[in-house]
């Protein structure tokens, strides 16, 4: 019985191998040549565009029959509009942008995201002068700050700005980008109102009732 079972299993495995090989050949034939060989890809000068730069320098695009031009863009909106209008064939862009286009939050369009270039790693940073004011409110261990640092440590600083009649400004890359969401979550969790959007009232600034003002600053700046 064991010998017979072994023979049956071997036959099944051989047939599976044959079927997989056939499927692979069929899929390869179905793909065919590139529909367009010359491509212009936009990018913002950030480290997460590195896969595109490496592929360009190492000749990986040409290995696939593609002749790619990489073109730096001044900000995310220019890049996004370039993809929508067809000026760019593709681009390194913020992960929520295709979702925003599909749902009509921005310009309504079908944007396909075939590849993820990064894991959305990010950090919240403050100016040295702001950190000096925050530091007394931050827990320390062996002379080093205990992470994660809550925005509660920033709250007294924001309050001192308010009393002095000065706005407390924070920058983020794009309204629909994860940077905006993460900053707002961090501030709110620490007791600082980040403001809210009120499109029904014609206010898309995201600063209604804000204690800290978030504004768009393109990455190159």
Regions found by a protein language model. Give the residues of each.
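Short, glycine-/small- and polar/acidic-enriched structural segments
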Residues: 30-215
